[in-house]
Amino acid sequence: MFDKFGEFDSYEEINRAAKAQLEEEGLEAIKTIAEENGLDPEDAEDFCTGAIEELTTPSLAAMGKLELEAKDLSLTGALRDWTDFIEQLCLEDEKMALAVRRKGKSLKDCMALILKNAFNDKAQLDDRITKAAGLTPPLYISIPGKAQIKEIVREYYLGEKK
């Protein structure tokens, strides 16, 4: 994912690298920085032409990282929904966006915590539901709600514990 320029710790680092590369290498280097960080290639062009002063913002940098990680993990279904929810949290809270961008924080580890919590909270479904689904009882399930996911995400990325 971060092959040429490495993983950046913040949107500021991305912007500093982009400014340095603009002076040295030009558009192709900026496009590589954008690609490695999940940023829009058009933003790279706009940055190079001076249409925008910075390549990225806190929320765009966080969402770009999440998108790259989700693609790398081939997330679909509920896990993709959870990723979208984390992106929404980044748009609502700059502190969250900054935390998601930090080195060492990963969507993989956050998803693992959500799944672990879900597994630990599993409950047996009523046998009538299980049978109506054509399955054999007993069946245990746990699907965390948004409030629970938000709590886990905030704890993982921000260190906040309720």
Language model segments and positions:
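Charged, amphipathic alpha-helical linker/scaffold segments
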Residues: 61-124
